[in-house]
């Protein structure tokens, strides 16, 4: 009987710990209403042993707007106004237009735009670490193994780490972070440069 009680207390304490970690993370994400930052991104492909470093700038505004601009080594822009998603490759002069998807596996930073942050509890098992960071383990997603979100002492986003089932690891470090800034909604509409090859997948969806 004593063993059963001890096991129950242990399991209960784990569940409480997960709940506390999830609540802490949700509170931090809720406090990010808008954000701009520069980023440095490192992709390590465990299958090919190739590394890819890139950098650029980003902005987001709840509940649905984000912009991700890579300036080096290639020119690429990913922009969404909540309805459409534009993926522009400046080197290829090509633009792909898609309907907005909530696919976190494709764009892990979408978790910061979650309209209903309580869904984090449904999608992930969250554990807190001592250095103001959180490990998210998907409950169903087969593509992502884990997401790590690290905050600074004043609760600004410091970095994201994403590990996938394809043995790929991505770390995105943020600097010059500004939160709760005034960003116009129209800045999240994309206008293609002249002579751009446009593939509009929304017409076939």
Curated annotation (Swiss-Prot):
Monomer. Belongs to the LolA family. It comes from the Bacteria. The lineage of its organism: Bacteria, Pseudomonadati, Pseudomonadota, Gammaproteobacteria, Thiotrichales. Keywords: Chaperone, Periplasm, Protein transport, Signal, Transport. The keyword Transferase does not apply. This is Outer-membrane lipoprotein carrier protein. It is found in: Periplasm. InterPro entries: LolA/LolB/LppX, OM_lipoprot_carrier_LolA-like, OM_lipoprot_carrier_LolA_Pbac. GO terms for biological process: lipoprotein localization to outer membrane; lipoprotein transport. Residues 1-19 form the signal peptide. Participates in the translocation of lipoproteins from the inner membrane to the outer membrane. Only forms a complex with a lipoprotein if the residue after the N-terminal Cys is not an aspartate (The Asp acts as a targeting signal to indicate that the lipoprotein should stay in the inner membrane). One of its GO terms (cellular component) is outer membrane-bounded periplasmic space.
């Amino acid at each position: 009987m004593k063993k059963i009680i001890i096991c129950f207390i242990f399991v209960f304490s784990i569940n409480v710990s997960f709940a506390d970690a999830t609540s802490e993370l949700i509170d931090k994400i809720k406090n990010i209403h808008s954000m701009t930052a520069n980023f440095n991104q490192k992709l390590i492909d465990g299958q090919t042993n190739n590394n890819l470093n890139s950098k650029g700038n980003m902005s987001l505004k709840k509940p649905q707007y984000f912009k991700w601009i890579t300036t080096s080594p290639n020119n690429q822009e990913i922009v969404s106004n909540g309805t459409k998603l534009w993926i522009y490759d400046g080197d290829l002069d090509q633009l792909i237009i898609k309907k907005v998807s909530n696919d976190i596996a494709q764009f892990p930073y979408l978790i910061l735009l979650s309209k209903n942050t309580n869904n984090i509890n449904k999608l992930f098992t969250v554990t807190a670490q001592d250095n103001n960071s959180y490990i998210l383990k998907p409950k169903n997603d087969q593509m992502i193994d884990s997401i790590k979100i690290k905050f600074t002492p004043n609760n600004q986003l410091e970095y994201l780490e994403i590990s996938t089932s394809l043995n790929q690891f991505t770390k995105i470090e943020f600097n010059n972070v500004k939160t709760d800034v005034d960003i116009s909604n129209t800045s999240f509409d994309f206008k293609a440069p002249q002579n751009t090859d446009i593939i509009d997948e929304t017409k076939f969806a």
